[in-house]
């Protein structure tokens, strides 16, 4: 696994916050249909071991973050932005092999 030194992950363990989640209902339905993942379950990812980094791949007009964490024993990647007292979920997908290896390496 090659690591990108410009890519910085912050490790969180069982984050306890007052943040809830919000999302676009149509996008939630599409992700549930196409990937079998429900945006409504994002809180479970944040409640467990997870890594979060700023998503600075481009200028989005808002702060975005990428979080990798476990959901029902599988590694999930979320893209989200803070909106008031909620995390607005933008996307949710299963991690690829490179992300899985990086996650396991950082846990070990």
Regions found by a protein language model. Give the residues of each.
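Ribonuclease/tRNase effector modules and their secretory precursors
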Residues: 1-108
